[in-house]
Design a protein with these regions (language model features):
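Generic secondary-structure signature for well-ordered alpha-helical cores
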Residues: 28-32, 55-56, 71, 106-110, ...
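Glycine/serine-rich phosphate-binding loop and adjoining beta1-alpha1 elements at the start
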Residues: 2, 8, 78-166
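Short, Lys/Arg-enriched charge-dense amphipathic segments
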Residues: 57-65, 104, 135-147, 172-187
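Glycine-rich phosphate/diphosphate-binding loop of Rossmann-like nucleotide-binding domains
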Residues: 6-45, 151-194
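An N-terminal-biased, well-structured beta-alpha scaffold segment characteristic
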Residues: 2-103, 107
Length: 194
């Protein structure tokens, strides 16, 4: 099967849908992979790493010509025009965007929205939401610490003592638990209402 990994075109998107490690596994199973030139640059993965894993580096039209297309976010209208009828697109496709889903259906494209995969032990390898929420919880506390005008941990100096920052974390899901752990590691006093 020919698998395409295009460059993500959404503003601010720095992720890539496949890593050299996953590409190596797919190639060992007999698949042919085309990665769009520069697809991994924003994720700190150069084209040479994909080539070393066995992928072919190509243009957008070649990556979108795959029978299976791996995307991080849903394709835009320009990208949809490059996808062949009968192709399969896998990624975080926003299954509640009826307009986009309708356009894919009209073009004969099969779509698998990973964010709609059940969050069960059996489907755990498809769970993209937990990993993204984990990163979001971590980053939220780092951003809060950056914007906080004082310090996160308690500091005792010759000039006096600075109390630890008080952090309120709303929610105790995957993101909330990671936020609690990060705030604690930074030395803040934290609270999460139950």
């Amino acid at each position: 099967m020919h698998i395409g990994v295009p460059l993500e075109m959404q503003a601010g998107e720095t992720r890539v849908a496949a890593t050299p490690e996953t590409i190596k596994k797919l190639i060992s199973q007999g698949h042919r992979i085309t990665v769009q030139r520069g697809a991994g640059i924003q994720a700190s993965v150069p084209d040479s790493a994909f080539e070393a894993a066995g992928a072919v580096i190509g243009e957008a039209s070649e990556a979108f010509a795959g029978e299976l297309i791996l995307k991080v976010v849903a394709p835009n209208d320009n990208e949809l025009a490059l996808i062949n009828s009968g192709s399969v697109v896998i990624g975080m496709l926003n299954p509640f965007n009826n307009e986009l889903i309708g356009k894919m259906a009209e073009r004969g494209i099969t779509a698998f929205a990973l964010e709609a995969a059940p969050r069960t032990s059996r489907a755990q390898s498809l769970d993209v939401l937990s990993s993204q929420a984990n990163i979001a919880g971590y980053k939220a506390v780092l951003l809060a610490a950056h914007h906080y005008p004082r310090f996160m941990p308690m500091l005792m100096t010759a000039a006096g003592t600075v109390k630890a920052a008080r952090v309120l974390i709303l929610g105790a899901g995957v993101a909330g638990l990671q936020a609690i752990a990060t705030a604690k590691r930074l030395g803040a006093w934290w609270k999460a209402p139950t």
